[in-house]
Amino acid sequence: MFDTIISNGIIIDGTKKPRYQADIGIQNGNIKTVGDLSNSKAKNIINAENLIISPGFIDMHTHSDISLVNDKYGESKAYQGVTTEVTGNCSFSPFPAGKKGPNNLKKGLWETAALADDPNTNWTWNTLNDWANTIEKNGTSINIAPQLGYLSLIHI
């Protein structure tokens, strides 16, 4: 018995094979079987008839570095099929803060890059690890691949 079966979906798997219709059996958060599962049982069944199922997309150019701190669900990305974001683009990253602290970095990035900041975000991190721990503590539903923006280095 599966936890979830996604049934009747049109699968485009990124391998250059033609699209095909199949079911997907999920157990413990992992895909276990792809094929005809019409005789299988599951706790949850999602009917994906006439819907496309594909692997998650990687968004290589994002500016979600700050919004990820507050947006634990990443809904704007998840609804588009994005499962991984690359941050730190266009020379901006919210770390390292250096000896002058995160508020100096925040101010410098605002003045230099016209950074749109959520006023509810309290920049308490100084390093990549601090930033990543803040996001992990708050929770997130997507994977993050951070880059160090060189503009941040100017302000430390």
Pin down the residues of each PLM region:
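Glycine-rich nucleotide phosphate-binding loop and flanking beta-alpha elements
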Residues: 38, 66, 93
